[in-house]
């Protein structure tokens, strides 16, 4: 097991230096198989340490499905917290949240069962969530009720009500990506076919997201283009054009030429479509 642990620790660096895509993919598959063998063979009690947690975070996939191995981690979270700190709790919180998101978006009320875990067997996990005016369970109830309403019920107004309550609780802890993704989900789930009041709220959220100084370049470009789309829906065509042009200018800073070219082509298409309307 010690040898396998060392191999997994060094694997990312080794895979990264493979020049041929086919060789890289072969090694990725081999390493994934080694990881599965490792967690199958090694008792969970022996994995409560920083090195193994680093390996888990590197190779374990959280895909919104129940996972027997991660359930074992939940059972041993108190030991993880003592030996590793709060990082495992944050990791397991992400695991449960992704399950709730998948179920809520699909309209499966089973997501409420996972909400119950927040102050049940996963209470220690969610103890890392700051509590201001409401419990962790209430906070995430607002969030996943919002996703249920938007993606399954197509209820944009209900979504806004729940998300506003969620953001009020987040307060200063809210990040640019929180506001930006909340706005983007409206278009992802409904194609923008919601009342104008909801579109106006997505504009408010996107403007807030763009006010953050620590926003990544890719997010900034994405949110500017989305703000352009929102202004277009609101028939504020001059404002839409300004947003698209600013998104294009920001894209000039990108280093990956292929990605830059694709993004700029998409922005040019948006500008051309806008000119046909004006």
Regions found by a protein language model. Name each.
Residues 3-278:
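Oxidative protein folding and maturation machinery
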């Amino acid at each position: 097991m010690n040898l396998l642990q060392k191999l997994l620790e060094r694997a990312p660096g080794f895979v990264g230096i493979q020049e041929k895509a086919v060789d890289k993919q072969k090694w990725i598959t081999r390493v994934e198989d080694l990881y599965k063998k490792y967690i199958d063979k090694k008792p969970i009690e022996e994995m409560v340490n920083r090195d193994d947690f680093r390996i888990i975070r590197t190779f374990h996939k959280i895909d919104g499905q129940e996972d027997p191995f991660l359930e074992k981690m939940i059972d041993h979270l108190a030991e993880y917290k003592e030996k590793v700190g709060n990082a495992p709790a944050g990791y397991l919180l992400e695991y449960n949240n992704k399950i709730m998101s998948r179920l809520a978006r699909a309209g499966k009320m089973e997501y409420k069962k996972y909400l119950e875990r927040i102050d049940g067997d996963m209470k220690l996990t969610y103890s890392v969530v700051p509590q201001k005016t409401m419990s962790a369970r209430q906070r995430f109830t607002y969030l996943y009720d919002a996703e249920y309403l938007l993606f399954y019920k197509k209820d944009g107004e209900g979504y806004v009500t729940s998300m506003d309550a969620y953001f009020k609780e987040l307060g200063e802890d809210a990040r640019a990506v929180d506001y930006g993704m909340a706005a983007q989900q409206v278009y992802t789930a409904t194609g923008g076919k919601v009342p104008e009041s909801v579109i106006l709220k997505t504009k408010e959220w996107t403007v807030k997201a763009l006010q953050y100084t620590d926003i990544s370049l890719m997010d900034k470009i994405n949110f500017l283009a989305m703000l352009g789309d929102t202004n277009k829906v609101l028939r504020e065509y001059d404002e839409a054009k300004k947003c698209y042009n600013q998104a294009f200018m920001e894209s000039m800073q990108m280093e990956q030429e292929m990605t830059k070219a694709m993004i700029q082509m998409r922005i040019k298409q948006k500008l051309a479509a806008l000119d046909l309307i004006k």
